[in-house]
Amino acid sequence: MTGYIHSKESFGTVDGPGIRYVLFMQGCPMRCLYCHNPDTWKMNGGEAVKSEDIIEEYWNNRHFYHDGGITVTGGEPLLQIDFLIELFRAAKEKGIHTCIDTSGITYAEKDVAYRKRLDLLMTYTDLVMLDIKHIDPDCHRRLTSRSNERPLAFAKYLEEKNVPLWIRHVVVDGYDKEEHLYALGEFIGRLSNLRALDVLPYHTMGVTKYKELNIPYPLEGVSATSRERAQEAKNIILRGIYSVRKAKK
């Protein structure tokens, strides 16, 4: 089956456990203000690739990835769910660890046909990295142009399916108040399948791409978030997690 990618990386170290072979899928319905890959937005672009060719390339270098696997990110990878099913099915036949890095924005709880395909994909998925952009609905819409209803419902779906979950959150100065971070911690603290938490500082490395594409940069004038601020935010989220889990005991 053919999929459409923006690019690929053969030495990914931040996209799941170990060294990863990373596919950046083409197409995304979100318009995150801090997106550093605006060239992945178009739905009809990208390089055509065959799932069997991806597996062959990985397998030929499998000793290099002995503690890693394949990660699909984006763009929004779940827009190409049928390609992912075929790719991950073939990967699992060879014992390759599989990971999806997603915003969860495509989740459609009431779409029976979609749920069946998603259920099938999850049987071949070892880890989901879910980017929760913001816990507050209004702030989420300001940051992404979309509601956070689907991403949060997707998180609960993953718990129901007992798919290991790795939460990611980007800290943007002026958008992440303490009460929001604590509430995010309370939400993810209730997820029994939570395996890891990444709190990442907003950076400005994507500014050049916006200039090249002649797109106004939406966070012009907003400073990059410091590592210290990101760690402070993570500590607040962790307090929210611990408060929920302590109450359960």
Report each predicted region and the residues it spans:
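Auxiliary Fe-S-binding modules of radical SAM enzymes
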Residues: 2-14, 171-249
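Short glycine-enriched, charge-decorated loop/helix-capping segments at active-site entrances
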Residues: 38-43, 141-147, 214-223
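Canonical Radical SAM [4Fe-4S] cluster-binding loop centered on the CxxxCxxC motif
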Residues: 1, 7-49
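Conserved AdoMet/S-adenosylmethionine-binding subsite of the radical SAM
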Residues: 59-69, 78-205, 212
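Conserved alpha-helical substructure of the radical SAM core
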Residues: 38-70
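Short acidic donor-binding/metal-coordinating loop in glycosyltransferase active sites
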Residues: 74-75
